[in-house]
């Protein structure tokens, strides 16, 4: 069994990944949120920090690339190889409209002929391992048999499938029937991704698909950072675990990010997922959300930890 951390844009940065690794770990691979491949070979300052080997020490990190241009993909992959990476991931799953309208992410799935040419070029021109993260299609799962014909032509490190279509975003439920059909015909190793929010969710998916050996989790980890540890038979997070995790995240953001506003933007996003682990936390979560200065934020966080009973995943 292998467990992977999904790449979540704007959230699972190197700061988040390092804190998660130090406090909980449990993951075999940590996927880095997508890098937009471009003709300009220079990575941005943020991208350089995210892919820096120093900031991913001890982890098997996999950078994700977003593009529909094969040459741009290859340039970016080769540059990542110089950083020491052995594997890259192609993003064919992002449902964001700003990405899809450019024909990237899940938007690329609507162009199967172009996608096939793209894959043919990148797999023939690099010796790096390439995994693919995909959805079932743009509009409906009936699009996927054609996509599978394409995917089966190429020696992927893994095919990571989120069994929703683009228009679902994160609504509805994963199409497990379609996933099972895909699993039966895939010539590549398949990884399951989608709606694993608890150890029970994991057991349910694993029992339904016993041949699947790899599972990717994203939002479930944001809501319970100890989820991978729990799945592996370890203990669930307690309040002190979450406090340690929070403090490490917060202090690192203060060191790495300039300005209270930017630091608090990051932390408020984290609390959107963490607050439900505490009973009767709405009042304090609101204070956290309204805080505009770090000193006010710190006071609100201390109040929440002091006054709200920690219930963990049961309060979701």
Stretches found by the model and what they are:
Residues 1-316:
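Flavin-dependent oxidoreductase catalytic cores
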